[in-house]
Amino acid sequence: MSTTPERSGGVDTILLVRLAAASVLLAVSLVLELSELLRTVLLAAAVVAAGYDIALEAVRSVQRKDFFAAPVVVLFVTAAALISGFFAETAAMVVLYQLGSAIVAYSQERLCQSALSNIGKSRTEIYEHISAMIGDREGARTAISSALESAAGAVLRFGIVIAVLFAVLVPLMTGLTYRVSIHRALVMILVCNTGSVVASLSCVTLTGMCSCAGKGIVTERAEALEALADTEVAVFDKSGVFTDSSPEVVAVEPVRLDRDTFITFAAHAAYYSEQSFAQAVADLYGKDYKLELIGDFVDIAGAGVELSIGGAHVVFGKRILFAGREEELPPDSAGTGQVYYMTVAGKYVGRLSVSSGMNPASENLVRDFRDEGVEKLVLLTEEGREESTVFAEEMRFTGLFSQCDTAAKLKCIRDMRSATSGNVVYIYANGVQMHTDADVDIRVSGRSKYADILVLPEYVDELPSALETAKRIKSISAINALITFAVKAVVITLALTGYCNLWLAVLLDSAAAVAAVFNSDKVSAESHARVYKRKK
């Protein structure tokens, strides 16, 4: 059966002592020749010793208006069975129910600790984040877990109706006594309890989250990881995902201006820009800005910026930005990096180079997404059409949007979301200061603000494995539910034919719950998942 939310996953010594005492009382009542009154007293004492906390939990559930919670169902069955005279069987049922709940809780705890070991305590923030989610059942909730819980609840309600009809009508149509029909009905109600179905659901999700976290992929909410399983469109922002996430200025070549003045002009020119080179220039400058000098700012995605600084017209950008203008630029140098030229009042004043190295970890990213069944792979970039097309063809993207500023990127994502029935995933590194219209926002960065999933830059090649994990979360959750529902069906069949009693129903249902919990570990089993190897 299910562990209750209030119970700790560790070994409860007091509970074990109570169960031992209840077992002794049960054994004494069955083995020794006692009067009926004394036997009844001993069995009642065994029930109270083993399960008084079930009554307390049932009261709390009723106060929360959760009338079909496991403690409420068990308390009802216990009371009805005692009233019907099944004292020894009821005592055995309560002992086994409590023991089964303790074993399930302990199994959940051990599985979660094993999953956490995949992260390693050296990653303190990630470890603490996932540890907190283990104690937060809502944080581990997914669409499939909610659906299965709802289905289990419906089965319980339907089972109660059928059990009541069976108890009332069958004696009228057959030779069964009401005592026998009530007994079989109680077994049906007990086994329809939702506990064993939901016991493994959070374990499956948390195991998957820990597996991903061990690969540098941290989820802010479990539903985001689950949503990856239904990815139809993957949208990639080139900057920071495929290119260097932290570009640097590698060369400064001023003309007419001294170096400090040139850098000051460049920093002010790039201050309001959302393009990746702007941060590199800001890092080089490192001084106070005089923003009142900046006017008429225009951010030209993929090319550069145009503005006025102190009333002087300034153009700062790639060579393509100066096409058709009167300013004459020197020929490209043989140095490395992307070159940005600057003119002030129509005069060329120098250039600087920004590193533009590729992120080796993303070399096979598009291919691996395609291997996971994602056919629509779209590239968003600030760069010009010609340069972007070459890169998109090399990486085999199926769609391209070039010269996109942040607003254009957000519009592209919004349009794709409205035109797609499946899920849209947006993978970016910087420049977006809000949640987009994508179903899942994945940020390649050390900071997770506005992202559903955070990927550490050096682990971006592991991202496709998160899709594999998401699919396994869904499939294993379904398998676990199938296991427990199948056991319930067998027990109900046995109950209807008179071959199952209360304690046997609890024993079989608890065994199914434990099996489902241990099966959850398959989410992270390397033998069942495609392995993505990082290029060193």
Give, region by region, the residue ranges found by the protein language model.
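Flexible metal-binding regulatory segments at protein termini and peripheral loops
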Residues: 1-38, 114, 124-140, 528-536
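Conserved cytosolic catalytic loops of P-type ATPases
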Residues: 1-4, 116-132, 158, 222-266, ...
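Hydrophobic alpha-helical transmembrane segments
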Residues: 43-85, 89-119, 126, 140-238, ...
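Conserved ATP-binding TGD loop and adjacent catalytic N/P-domain core of P-type ATPases
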Residues: 117, 124, 129-132, 136-140, ...
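Active-site-proximal glycine-rich helix-loop-beta segment
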Residues: 193-195, 232, 238-239, 244-245, ...
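P-type ATPase nucleotide-binding
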Residues: 249, 253-375, 385, 397-415, ...
